[in-house]
Amino acid sequence: MYKRSDKVAEAIHELVSGLLVKGLKDPRIGFVTITGVKVSDDIRHATIYYTVMGSDEAKKSTLHGLNSSVGFIRKEVSKELRLRFAPELIFKYDESIEYGNRIDQLLKEIGSEEGGND
C-alpha cells in the first residue's frame, strides 16, 4: 500500500528528471541523474538524490547549479503536482553508486588474489 508521500516522491522524481533534461539552462549542471527522492510524510520536505559523471569539481559545480535552481524547480513541482504547499527541496549527492563500485573492485581484487594462490 502506497502512502501519499511515496506517490509525490515518484512524481517529483519524474518531473525533476525531465526538467534537468530540457528545462534548466545552467551550464554548471552537467550530466546529472536523479537516483531517488524521499519525501517527508507531511510533504513539506523532499530530499533529491543525484549522481554526476565527472570530477570532484564537476560534482561541486553541479551542486551549486542545482541549489541556485531550487526556486524554479520548486515552483514547477508545485504547479505540476497542484500541491497546496511546495515541499522544500534539498539536493544531496548519492554516494551509493561509487560505494558499490568500490566494493565490487575490492571483491574482484580478492578474487584475483585467491585465483593466483592456487
UniProtKB/Swiss-Prot annotation:
Classification via Gene3D superfamilies: 3.30.300.20
A GO MF label: ribosomal small subunit binding
Superkingdom per UniProt: Bacteria
Pfam families from the UniProt entry: RBFA
Keyword Cytoplasm set for record: yes
PROSITE patterns assigned to the protein according to its UniProt record, in alphabetical order: RBFA
Record's keyword terms, sorted: Cytoplasm, Ribosome biogenesis
Segments passing through the bilayer: none
Compartment(s) of residence: Cytoplasm
A GO-annotated cellular component: cytosol
Disulfide partners: none
One GO term (biological process): maturation of SSU-rRNA
InterPro entries: KH_dom-like_a/b, RbfA, RbfA_dom_sf, Ribosome-bd_factorA_CS
Subunit structure: Monomer. Binds 30S ribosomal subunits, but not 50S ribosomal subunits or 70S ribosomes.
Main function: One of several proteins that assist in the late maturation steps of the functional core of the 30S ribosomal subunit. Associates with free 30S ribosomal subunits (but not with 30S subunits that are part of 70S ribosomes or polysomes). Required for efficient processing of 16S rRNA. May interact with the 5'-terminal helix region of 16S rRNA.
PANTHER family in UniProt: RIBOSOME-BINDING FACTOR A, CHLOROPLASTIC-RELATED
Family, as annotated: Belongs to the RbfA family.
Name of this protein: Ribosome-binding factor A
